[in-house]
């Protein structure tokens, strides 16, 4: 069933305290609105709980449990994160609501005024190495913060990174809706028979292997961060092609080595190109794993 975001007027009927509601975007089963709430502008998020009518009660309960569990996990992680490189929760506490006979969970995050990397890529922006290093450092700090909580983001991609164009807080990582906690009970219902949650173009190769959850760690986020930086720098994804079907894309992720970033951006330093290339290795053990050392080298402009 296609997700239709609730109308702005519908939201105002439930949240009468909003002085202004403006739809921003939607993806998956989530919609985001810019609202004027208690403390000024906030990003109001409304997440649809899938309908399960016509499904066996036991399966229906598991699907609902997974959906609500992911929302609760995301909110808990955001509440625990202190890094400015990760989006913050807003003032509106989670609330289950019914709109047009559909069930949602609604809450807010801080409103971030900027552009996603996806928008900048579409504008054919060619970032400088200084800009790319700043992005690199921000993503590494976000990954480090999440891993300190035993969490893997699992969906780092250009759509989920915001450029605020501020010296004190240049890039921010968004959307922890499918974050994975190695210390929690797995949420995915019937996970052995489903592809892993995530955006397939940005999946690390190991996530396509049987039993991947048992050995998953922050190096999967390292891989996805490198893909994101590569695509922003080069203006194109190193493996996925726009006309590919899902199977072709997944096959490239597992089997094909990407071209060096240097083939598209020879103006970048050998250290920067080499580090991104190394982060895109198929085997996690071959990727750089000392985040603090990487940040130190990037900050010192090695």
Map each language-model feature to its residues:
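Conserved activation segment of eukaryotic-like protein kinases, specifically the C-terminal portion
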Residues: 191-207
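Catalytic-loop of the protein kinase fold
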Residues: 147-164
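Activation segment signature within eukaryotic-like protein kinase domains
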Residues: 135-136
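AlphaC helix of the eukaryotic protein kinase fold
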Residues: 58-80
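Conserved HxN/HPN-centered segment at the entrance to the catalytic loop
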Residues: 82-93
């Amino acid at each position: 069933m296609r997700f239709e975001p609730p109308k702005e007027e519908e939201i105002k009927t439930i949240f009468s305290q909003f002085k202004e509601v403006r739809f921003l975007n939607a993806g998956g089963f989530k919609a985001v609105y810019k609202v004027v709430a208690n403390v000024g502008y906030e990003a109001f998020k409304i997440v649809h709980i899938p309908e399960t009518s016509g499904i066996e009660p036991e399966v229906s309960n598991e699907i609902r449990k997974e959906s609500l569990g992911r929302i609760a996990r995301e909110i808990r992680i955001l509440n625990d994160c202190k890094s400015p490189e990760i989006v913050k929760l807003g003032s509106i506490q989670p609330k289950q609501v019914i709109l047009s006979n559909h069930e949602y969970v609604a809450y807010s995050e801080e409103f971030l005024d900027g552009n996603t990397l996806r928008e900048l890529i579409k504008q054919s922006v060619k970032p400088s190495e200084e800009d790319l290093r700043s992005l690199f450092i921000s993503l590494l700090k976000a990954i480090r913060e999440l891993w300190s909580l035993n969490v893997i983001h699992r969906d780092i991609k250009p759509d989920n990174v915001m450029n605020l164009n501020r010296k004190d807080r240049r890039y921010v990582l968004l959307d922890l809706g499918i974050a994975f906690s190695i210390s929690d009970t797995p949420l995915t219902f019937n996970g052995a028979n489903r592809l892993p949650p995530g955006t397939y173009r940005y999946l690390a190769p190991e996530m396509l292997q049987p039993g991947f959850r048992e050995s998953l760690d922050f190096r999967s986020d390292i891989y996805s961060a490198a893909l994101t930086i590569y695509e922003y720098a080069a203006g194109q994804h190193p493996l996925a092609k726009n006309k590919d079907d899902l199977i072709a894309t997944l096959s490239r992720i597992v089997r094909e080595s990407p071209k060096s970033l240097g083939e598209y951006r020879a103006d970048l330093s050998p250290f920067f190109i080499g580090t991104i290339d190394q982060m895109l290795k198929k085997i996690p053990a071959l990727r750089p794993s000392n985040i603090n050392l990487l940040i130190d080298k990037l900050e010192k402009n090695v």
